Amino acid sequence: MADQPNPAPPKPGLKRRWLFVILAMTFLFVLMPFLFWQATWFGKPLNDAQLQKSLVDREHPREIQHALSQVADRMLARDTFTRDSARQFYPQVVQIAQNGQDELRLTAAWVMGQDNSVSDFHQELLRLLQDPNPMVRRNAALGLVRFSDASGLAEIRSMLQPSAIGAHEAGALDERLKPGESINPGTLLGHIRSGDSTSELRSQIPGTIRQWLVPDKAAVTKGQPVLLVDPSVGEMWESLRALYIVGQLEDLPAIENIARGAGEVPANVRQQAELTTTAIRSRQPH
């Protein structure tokens, strides 16, 4: 048998080159989650100068959100010096609540609820009860509870009830999601087609789709309710905690229904409902 030719030896740099490629890819898989974490995590401390700069960075709303979160962290700090250092940024917080985008007004409302000694915060939260965004209104209502102000009681109650989502314009509705699916603020629910144009129907609230109120492909008018959404667990939890303080006798049927475990209610929410029921009853004259 004739000798078979020996295979050509590998090029000297081939193994090393592949090693570098593998190491580089491994590094990227580690690096990318870290960079993403850096971009989305609001815990990175900011000094005073960075906070001042970020709070007015209108081109980067996420920087403003980061700064607002840092102001709240200072407000909640244990030591007096750190808490007092947050006060210099209070005027910017109010300004953002008045002029910011939806996400910024929502965050500002949450921040203002952390210090119930500031009358400007109290007044601004009252104004935000009329905000067009339901999540801003809800955060404002919850924040007012910290001021022992029940002006947002209607909003707090609504967080325990199904919410209707209306069509933002007239046209034919193309439904995208089905009953039972969870949604969050910004979730794409469907499209509305009007002539040659198509617009997106998105949710402003979290929850679970209970039912569509109109058939798929049906013609809808602007403002017409098209979808019914059950509240999210988080919304129910926050509402019950607020009602613990400002709830009234007329709130008991809905709260006791939750305490009995109606629907798929987690144990901690049922427990909070029981505590809230007890607190409301204890405030009634005997």
Which residues does each PLM region occupy?
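Hydrophobic membrane-insertion alpha-helices, especially the h-region
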Residues: 19-38
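Amphipathic alpha-helical scaffolding segments comprising HEAT/armadillo-like alpha-solenoid repeats
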Residues: 41-55, 77-98, 117-130, 149-162, ...
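Short inter-helical turns and helix N-cap capping residues of alpha-solenoid HEAT/ARM repeat scaffolds
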Residues: 59-60, 100-101, 132-133, 164, ...
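Conserved hydrophobic register position within alpha-solenoid helical repeats
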Residues: 64-67, 108, 140-141, 239, ...
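Core register positions within helices of long alpha-helical scaffolds
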Residues: 70, 111-114, 143-146, 242-245, ...
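Short histidine-centered loop motifs in beta-beta connectors
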Residues: 167-182, 209-216
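Short hydrophobic beta/alpha edge segments that flank linear recognition/processing sites
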Residues: 180-201, 217-233
